[in-house]
């Protein structure tokens, strides 16, 4: 018995140092390696290489204390290369205070700067971000309109649904996706009624989120109407959408809607009497 204990002790004595060496060290706090004073000087230096290196360091650290420094840079203005990086870093930090500094850039002359600004506003959030994205929907840049629509959906900007309907006929599929996430009541019925009037490829991104929403904002009658219209289409795309909806239908959803989807996939007519 004593010999066995001695062997176990010897094994543990050999393993513990190795385990201690293999164990990962505790990660330092994100702001530990970021010197705000030196970072501020680099951002104000006017030297492109130093400025870009400082922005890289800020993003790597994830230190929200640096957000005002990036905001100040955006307010001062810079070359397109620096602006792109600064806007992206501000978005990565995700501070609502940064939205005011980013917002003007959705109207920048360079398309890439405009789209990067719209992407970052979806992360910095707030009323300023929502207003800027709604303004971006009215622009002439199709890619910017799509990015703005995505951002409004991500931000839960329900007041923007009327604006999204305006750009939907301009073949902005991202607007359909956002409407499917945000619509309520008659807005959802209006959206479903557009099936067949607008190209399916434009509309389809909004159908799945609409069918899978569990709150009372989306009328079940609108869901049943959509299910029946998709059944009547009898296309591969429509059937695939219904199959995806059935496979991912939430447990908290109305079981009658789930049953209606299943019935439609089997070729059975779906009516409001299903409720």
Predicted regions and their residues:
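Positively charged n-region of N-terminal signal peptides that target proteins for export
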Residues: 1-4
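Structural detector for internal amphipathic alpha-helices that build alpha-solenoid repeat scaffolds
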Residues: 23-31, 41, 49-63, 72-73, ...
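Bacterial N-terminal signal peptides
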Residues: 6-17
């Amino acid at each position: 018995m004593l010999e066995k204990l001695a062997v176990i002790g010897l094994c543990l004595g050999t393993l513990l140092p190795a385990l201690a060496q293999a164990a990962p060290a505790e990660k330092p706090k994100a702001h530990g390696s970021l010197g705000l004073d030196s970072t501020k000087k680099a951002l104000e230096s006017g030297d492109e290489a130093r400025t870009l290196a400082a922005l890289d360091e800020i993003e790597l650290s994830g230190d929200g204390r640096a957000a005002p420094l990036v905001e100040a840079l955006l307010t001062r203005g810079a070359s397109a290369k620096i602006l792109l990086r600064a806007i992206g870093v501000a978005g990565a930090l995700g501070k609502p205070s940064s939205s005011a500094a980013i917002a003007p850039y959705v109207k920048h002359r360079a398309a890439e700067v405009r789209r990067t600004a719209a992407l970052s506003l979806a992360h910095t959030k707030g009323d300023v971000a929502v207003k800027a994205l709604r303004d971006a929907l009215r622009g002439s840049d199709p890619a910017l309109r799509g990015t703005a629509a995505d951002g409004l959906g991500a931000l839960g900007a329900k007041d923007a649904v009327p604006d999204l309907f305006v750009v939907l006929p301009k073949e902005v599929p991202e607007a359909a996706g956002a409407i499917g996430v945000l619509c309520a009541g008659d807005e959802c019925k209006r959206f479903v009624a557009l099936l067949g009037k607008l190209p399916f490829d434009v509309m389809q991104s909004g159908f799945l989120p609409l069918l899978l929403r569990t709150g009372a904002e989306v009328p079940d009658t609108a869901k049943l109407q959509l299910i029946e219209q998709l059944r009547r289409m009898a296309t591969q795309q429509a059937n695939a959408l219904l199959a995806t909806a059935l496979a991912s239908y939430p447990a908290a959803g109305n079981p009658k809607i789930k049953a209606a989807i299943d019935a439609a996939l089997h070729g059975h007519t779906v009516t409001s009497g299903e409720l």
